[in-house]
Amino acid sequence: MDPDALFALLNRYFEAIAEPVLAEQGLLDKFIGDALMAEFGVPRHRGDQQEALAAVRAALAMQANLAELNRELEQEGLEPLQQGIGIHFGEVIAGNLGSSHRLEYTVIGSPVNLASRLESLTRQFPQHPILISATVRELLGDHAVVQCLGLCPVKGWPDPIEVFSLQALQS
């Protein structure tokens, strides 16, 4: 694919996945290559369970939007796209980070790293595109249908973590 077509495709993809984040009052932090980093609960926090529910609603809507985009791509003779989503919840440091020449509002901390590691694990579980931590699972309570994938080793963590596949939300 030529560079112009690749950029056009990435922009279509980002449009499809950014909308659900904004609809759930999430923050679009940054686009990194073909990835989107988003947060919920910063700079305003609505409560732990509310933020966890907003994040998983956005993730499920992102999956639905990707399915629609893939139908369009297939009609255009292009290969479908795949995505993996990792969701974790925890205390982070939020603020402007960078140099005097360029500052960006972002979050840092181990919860950010663990969410990224969960996203990476989706490559090992391609049939489970949305992975959540035990912390998120607990916050969701009976609102979510999940499948436990067991304890998984995670780069940078001393012990394996319990990983769940998000299937759906219950009304």
Per-segment meaning from a language model:
Residues 39-50, 85-105, 122-128:
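Catalytic strand-loop-helix junctions within cyclic-nucleotide turnover domains
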